Amino acid sequence: MSSRSELLLDRFAEKIGVGSISFNENRLCSFAIDEIYYISLSDASDEYMMIYGVCGKFPTDNPNFALEILNANLWFAENGGPYLCYESGAQSLLLALRFPLDDATPEKLENEIEVVVKSMENLYLVLHNQGITLENEHMKIEEISSSDNKHYYAGR
């Protein structure tokens, strides 16, 4: 029997016009949007799914990075997420958003994925404009925007 996340993922794949996408043996489903934004969905429980945006590797040469990340995480928390987290295997910064499965639709999932993508763009630009660059071979500042963002904005 399929989980609620699996059923939603099937409907989401149909909505966006891809053949099929599914969770792997670790209950993760990963994909790229425009070959720039890497997203992972986790079938965390029968109550919710997690949406992760892969931002990039931690810069080890910038002393202000940790403080700026704490500042960003507070800002995201005040605005309902997503939240910054660290994935030790890839030594990468992620944005994580909890997506409740009650009354979930493919449209709602797509909207929340878009919130994560917009938040990734904003985080990347704000950090870049403060001289902090996340190591990410896919997200290039030129591909995102030439915006002069110096402040975070709500992705919703």
UniProtKB/Swiss-Prot annotation:
Domain of life: Bacteria
Biological process annotations from GO: protein secretion by the type III secretion system
Pfam families tied to this protein: CesT
Subcellular location: Cytoplasm
Keywords: Chaperone, Cytoplasm, Virulence
GO cellular component: cytoplasm
Function comment: Chaperone for the type III secretion of Tir. Probably stabilizes the protein, prevents inappropriate protein-proteininteractions and aids in secretion.
Similarity-based family: Belongs to the CesT/SycH chaperone family.
Name under which the protein is recorded: Tir chaperone
Gene field: cesT
